[in-house]
Amino acid sequence: MSIEIEAELQTAVDKRRNFAIISHPDAGKTTLTEKLLLYGGAIQEAGAVKAKRAQRHATSDWMAMEQQRGISITSTVLQFDYQNCQINLLDTPGHQDFSEDTYRTLAAADNAVMLEDSAKGLEPQTRKLFEVCKMRKLPIFTFINKMDRPGREPLELLDEIEQELGLKTYPVNWPIGMGDRFKGVFDRRKEQIHLFERSIHGRKAAVNTVVNLGDPQIEKLLDQDLYYQLKEDLELLDELGSALDLEQIHTGEMTPVFFGSAMTNFGVQLFLDAFLEYALKPGIHKSTVGEVSPTYPNFTGFVFKLQANMDPKHRDRVAFIRVCTGKFEKDMTVSHARTGKTVRLSRPQKLFAQDRASIENAYPGDIIGLNNPGVFAIGDTIYNGKKIEYEGIPCFSPEIFAYLRNPNPSKFKQFRKGVNELREEGAVQIMYSADEAKRDPILAAVGQLQLEVVQFRMQNEYGVETRVEMLPFTVARWVDGGWEILQKVGRLFNTVAVKDSWGRPVLLFKNQWNCQQVESEHPELKLNNTAPVVSGQEPESL
């Protein structure tokens, strides 16, 4: 590798940061996302999630159903520049039914931001997603939100993180007051107090007063009890708290903690500044040939998301690619690891929710959008030079199953197109009866809302009204050994065998007990709760 190419790649890597935000529903994730964009200069005014008509819709919530309901139901990518760095912000669905989409997004992230509601602390969805971050050893930054509302004591919230998640905590800033008396935060990095003023609905960047802790005017700016409480808290943190350890942050053992209020912009810019300093740059990825450095000269990347109809006018399909190594260039020809085919990557795009702009090149850590003519599947690797294939992204085990019926035969073409495209992007898993005569697709979802989203999008994007018929199953297991082993076992009690989109056998059980009973009676059956990663095989279409 030439010194010039290595230097170009290293410079690009040093300037890049990316992260995904994880949280429980209603912790304020979309609001925080908007405010980070506001401070990053990517938008001029933030839009409330549950917007009045006069207000803007949140930038990241671009799908029609998201704007109607005020919830995020698909991951979006938001890219902006801040302080000479390029930040890729991967906004994820907060609703628990879409945890699979979040899981796929975390595969493309180098860092995670864990968002907590100060009144609620750790919540079930946050814990679940934390486990995924822990498994991937992602650095985790914690933002404790809604400090301008009544909430739990900061020390109690830190203790909960340490005891329940096993993380060391380091508060980078510390709140001054809570609820109506929340005045701002103390920045421990620079030993400065930031006193904030509310902006109208938090739509503009907050104006704040910055003073040193020893400044005589502090006692005039703060109520006496808040001032003495702050000094007492800081002494306690210095005496009993952990010291900041960048290595432990990068290995996911320590979480830097920030306090603030995304709605009123308190503490958002301080978080962004510290994130740039502490976050992990794009790093190595595990592959079939071992660990690959981002400065490896040949381009490689993987597909972590597919999205149909980002621009409903053009009925397009976009593949979201995480660039892992080398330099991506427009119109380059690459190899597709799963099929062995060569693909020309034309019309690459920089993404910003549903908005896109053409790009000429991209570097490790970047997320780019490529037109998908039906070639790509989630988890696919594309590469130049020597074959490299990254670890695939497994499917979650669904818990809700239903036939999707098309009551209007004249709409079959649109119905088929919608089902195939929504399957490709992972909006829902699609299964089929093992009986070839029954061709109605079976929707396999993590939660009820996923089924509603499929029906809404079939109507809104494909013009097809559908009917859902629920099935009495709650557990799915993939069968090792394929159909041959199932035929040897014969009929199973209270169980139905279906095939997934790749033609592999999946057993559906009415409940967990039913599943355990079959495993106990048939030890020769090896059952998995995640789908095996496929290679060199095309999925079945309707």
UniProtKB/Swiss-Prot annotation:
GO BP field: regulation of translational termination
tr-type G domain ranges (all copies): 14-283
Subcellular location: Cytoplasm
InterPro entries documented for this protein: EF-G-like_DII (IPR053905), EFG_III/V (IPR035647), G_TR_CS (IPR031157), P-loop_NTPase (IPR027417), PrfC (IPR004548), RF3_C (IPR032090), RF3_dom_3_sf (IPR038467), RF3_GTP-bd (IPR041732)
Top-level taxon of origin: Bacteria
Pfam families noted in UniProt: EF-G_D2 (PF22042), GTP_EFTU (PF00009), RF3_C (PF16658)
Keyword Nucleotide-binding among record annotations: yes
Molecular-function GO terms, alphabetical: GTP binding; GTPase activity; translation release factor activity, codon nonspecific; translation release factor activity, codon specific
Annotated residues for binding of GTP: 23-30, 91-95, 145-148
One cellular component (GO) term of this entry: cytosol
Keywords for the protein's UniProt record, in alphabetical order: Cytoplasm, GTP-binding, Nucleotide-binding, Protein biosynthesis
Functional description taken from the UniProt entry: Increases the formation of ribosomal termination complexes and stimulates activities of RF-1 and RF-2. It binds guanine nucleotides and has strong preference for UGA stop codons. It may interact directly with the ribosome. The stimulation of RF-1 and RF-2 is significantly reduced by GTP and GDP, but not by GMP.
UniProt family annotation: Belongs to the TRAFAC class translation factor GTPase superfamily. Classic translation factor GTPase family. PrfC subfamily.
Protein name: Peptide chain release factor 3
Species the sequence originates in: Trichodesmium erythraeum (strain IMS101)
